[in-house]
């Protein structure tokens, strides 16, 4: 048999994207962009409806950092609508639930890394992913891929997670107590 393996890199995998988004948020990057990127990785314990509602709300209202930390209360359809329909209320609830989960996790992460060294930052990023449900979501994704595309594809998805987590471990090992500016 002829095997034609394609070289792959975890650089653009969901785990790497999630870690990059978290690090960008720690550096003070735009919350709207990075929180929606994080939500769309599929590694947060959010339903597809919650992710869509969050992204639509963020697109409609362009919340600043302060607005992300406050409860979402505006009509998901925008300025022109006064009365909330049942669908609007549901979308608002989904967006608010997603906002709260993401912002709470990121704010906890910020508190843990403030003035921290490389080891503390690596550990805090891992535990933030864990708080967001990333391990369970990744395991579910691997099983879905196994059922749809077979064992080799599932093993590749699992490898992507393992490589990114190993990179966090190596950062902690190599830099240890060194101060790192995120």
PLM region spans:
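Polyanion-engaging groove/track-forming segments
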Residues: 1-182
């Amino acid at each position: 048999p002829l095997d034609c393996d394609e070289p792959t890199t975890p650089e653009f995998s969901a785990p790497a994207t999630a870690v990059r988004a978290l690090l960008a948020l720690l550096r003070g990057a735009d919350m709207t962009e990075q929180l929606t990127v994080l939500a769309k990785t599929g590694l947060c314990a959010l339903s597809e409806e919650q992710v869509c509602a969050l992204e639509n709300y963020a697109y409609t209202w362009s919340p600043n950092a302060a607005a992300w930390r406050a409860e979402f209360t505006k009509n998901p359809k925008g300025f022109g609508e006064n009365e909330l329909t049942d669908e609007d209320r549901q979308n608002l609830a989904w967006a608010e639930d997603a906002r709260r989960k993401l912002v709470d996790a990121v704010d906890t992460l910020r508190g843990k890394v403030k003035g921290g060294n490389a080891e503390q930052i690596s550990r805090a990023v891992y535990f933030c992913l864990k708080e967001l449900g990333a391990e369970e979501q990744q395991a579910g994704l691997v099983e879905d891929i196994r059922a749809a595309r077979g064992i080799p594809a599932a093993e590749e998805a699992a490898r992507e997670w393992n490589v990114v987590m190993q990179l966090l471990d190596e950062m902690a090992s190599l830099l240890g107590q060194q101060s790192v500016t995120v």
